[in-house]
Amino acid sequence: MPGSSQGQSPLSVERNREFFARDVYGHNADRLDSHVRIRAAVTAELAGTGRLLDVGNGGVFEYDPAVAEQVLACDLFLDESMSPEYPDNVTIARGDALDLHEELGTHDVVLEAFLYHHLTGRRASDSVDNIRRAIGQAKGRLEPGGRLVVVESCIPAALYPLERALYPPLQLLARTRLLGGHPATLQLPIALLRRLIAEQLTIEKSVRIPLGRWVTQFGRPFPAALTPVRAHLIVARKAS
């Protein structure tokens, strides 16, 4: 999901804004079997949360908001005026994953779900810098001993060089109708993502979420058996 601006290219920001405003992803997340499994896994992980900061929410809850006493969901195109559309324990706010303005050290859990592959810049190499910054921003909002919960789609390490090489033409395609309005994205191998998180937090859990028959690929339903992309859940803790 979208959620940053400083390290993202203007095209990435605008395409993310337009895509998620149309709620294409949210429609698929509500009905595809893989997303049902992901929602169950994330809901279980968040059970008993007090104050949850959901960064890059995109207007889509990858969990049952009732599991937390308070939820603050932020993204670039969300606005506080939208809060009445959601459960009473949910507050909606405009927010940037790379430049959060929420108070430091005030949340026991920060969730960043399917955010990182959207944090693309003009070059493929910008993604790593953006993700590292997003993790740092999330860490700052955690109280001592708080947890960062990451849900992310990752590719096999062997395909990462190819994906990076294909990123420039993918950016060009994102300017056309061929991607259906979906922004150019770039997924990391799970080992690289774990390494970026471990630079700043202590990883306590890293598991693959089993997929069903269908996933979303560039926002469209796609057979899971035909894509190398897999969903991972990582839980990391800030020092007490």
Name what the model sees in each region:
Residues 111, 115:
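A conserved beta-strand element that flanks and buttresses the S-adenosyl-L-methionine
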Residues 98-110:
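A short acidic, Gly/Pro-enriched loop at the edge of an enzyme's catalytic core
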Residues 128-144:
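A short glycine-rich, Lys/Arg-flanked "PGG" loop and its adjoining helix->strand segment in the class I
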Residues 53-100:
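Class I SAM-dependent methyltransferase SAM/SAH-binding core
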